[in-house]
Amino acid sequence: MKVLLVDDSVTMRRIQKTQIQGLGINDIVEAGDGEEAFRKLQENMPIDLIMLDWNMPVMDGLTFLKKVRADNSFKNVKVIMCTSESEKTRVVEALKSGANNYLVKPFTPDALKEKLGI
């Protein structure tokens, strides 16, 4: 499995990367905002999963998600929103925009494992 990890916080990316690697997944590409993430998505296909923060500079996670879902070449890429946005309307908005799942930060390795289905 190849993962694109998108978060503007280097610390948060480091924490999430460690959690992902703890599940035996080591093919991880990182990006600090939605614009960089879209470039890296195009350059590193096939990507199986995008773990996506909501609040980022340049291009936020929801805008990035909508851009990914508008491009048919990425239709099979799974997206998990990993964000501190826990308000129900925000969760619904992300899922309606094409997220496959949603994790509220901070989350445990077990919660991540459950969302990944492994």
Label every model-predicted segment:
Residues 10-29:
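Two-component/phosphorelay signaling modules centered on CheY-like receiver
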Residues 39, 62-75:
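Short amphipathic alpha-helix used as the core "switch/output" element in two-component signaling
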Residues 30-39, 61:
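Helix N-cap/capping motif at the beta->alpha junctions
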Residues 56:
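Receiver (REC) domain active-site loop signature in two-component systems and cognate sites
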Residues 45-51:
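Active-site beta3 strand of CheY-like receiver
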Residues 107-116:
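C-terminal output helix
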Residues 17, 63, 86-101:
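Alpha4 helix (beta4-alpha4-beta5 surface) of REC/receiver domains from two-component response regulators
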